[in-house]
Amino acid sequence: DVTVVASPWNFPVAIPVGGVAAALAAGSAVILKPAPPAKRCAAELVAAFHEAGIPKDLVALAPLEDGDVSRYLVTHEAVDRVVLTGSYDTARLFRSWKPDMHLLGETSGKNAIIVTPSADPDLAVRDVVHSAFAHAGQKCSASSLLVLVGSAGKSARIARQLVDAAASLRVGGPASLDSQVGPVVVPDDEKAVRGLTTLGEGEHWVLKPRYLGDGLWTPGIRAGVVPGSEFHLTEYFAPVLGVMRVDTLEEAIEVVNEVDYGLTSGLHTLDTEELALWLEGIEAGNLYVNLGITGAIVRRQPFGGWKRSAIGSTTKAGGPSYLLGLGEVQAAPEGAAAPEAAHSTPTLAPRVRALCDAVRDQLSAAELAELRRAVAADASAWESDYGANRDVTGMACERNILRYRATPVLLRAGDGTALADVARVLAAGLLAGGPIGVSVAQELPAPLMSVLLAAGVEVSVEDARAWESRLATVSNSGGLGMRVRILGPREEASAQRWDRATRASWGSPDVALYTGAV
């Protein structure tokens, strides 16, 4: 097994360490392909792995410039998967080279902080300025949008403090120990330069950025950013912040969610009702309340996003599920010991219980027993992990809560799929509670159809050609964050389903495909 870790330049050590270590832990050899500006850091990192005892044939360095040779590496038939930290455009480029690439990505972010009238203005300004301009705005988690709600958008105090705080930051090279804003690493990046120099319609500078040479820019703040504008929707790796004004928190949430990305997001408020509304409605992977939105810490704040900020079957880096994306689930051999949870008798959700009852007469005794063990294990995992908000750090000064959110899922059961497998996957989907669509090659039993219709699950009977046409439409029409679970005959290799699905979806990075065994 071979994994290519394609790491960025903005975290030249921490991110590749995480990717390489995770791939090794999952049992894969690793080729580290760093971004060109970070090649020297990557060389030292690989040497450290070797000095620690990792064999040289398990961790290799490919210090390549971007171009044909890099393309040859990531598309090589011997590479089983690519772990990318970079832009969404890079993920799309990789998939255009090889549509069936197993690509796991943490990609772009267009991140915002919302400030409501109830916020502490001093604390809010401090966190906005740090989140926008530290590292010269070159963290994928950096905030390039400030959304002011109601009277906060008319506050002379907030406006004055924001401009004063940003203007007072010390700009300088890395050799200056007092530098607070360093150089733009790729100074000729067209998008970054545009963000620092070109205003959109109705926008104006309240703090105009200045170029000092050697890649150094003073911070810039533009006001008058409107929904749907380029600055509202585009990620800029540069020290520039755009200010938007809305009347209500509901409008602010809508404005933030209009962006195709969902990496980090922040809220400054002292109102618990506002906090509850925001937590329920905002679409981002890492949420920060009355804090800056950068600087996630492994385990305490595992890192990863929604929509176009996450590619493939990846989960949060530094979190408890990260290794799951680096392997494939396989059915346990017959007679293997079942997990302890499978022997417990947790309370089943009513919909799950109804599903089991609906297929009881269509399954063999062995299949029914296996389904019951599976849903019991699901229920136990739901109670302890997936359905519970957990703070594993237990810090006295702050709460770090890990929660799971249901996302839309499209299930396809092709010709020859066992009903037991369909029931098992549907049981998990009904428990999670997210929107489910089902495509089947053969009609499902009437009792099962009744349960699904009562649960609001749309079921379509379609042949392979109709299904592939549907998958192509879903994959290329903005179905951001969609999960597609594809089942087939148990004797069929998951790689065959993967190949068919990636061809049908044209390698779109906007959907995550799951084709493994049940």
What are these regions (language model features)?
Residues G19-A26, A427-L431:
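Conserved short alpha-helical elements in the N-terminal third of ANL/AMP-binding
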Residues S28, K98-H102, G434, A504:
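A short helix->loop->beta-strand "cap" motif at the edges of active sites that frequently abuts
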Residues L84-S96:
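Short gly/Ser/Thr-rich phosphate-binding loop of adenylate-forming enzymes
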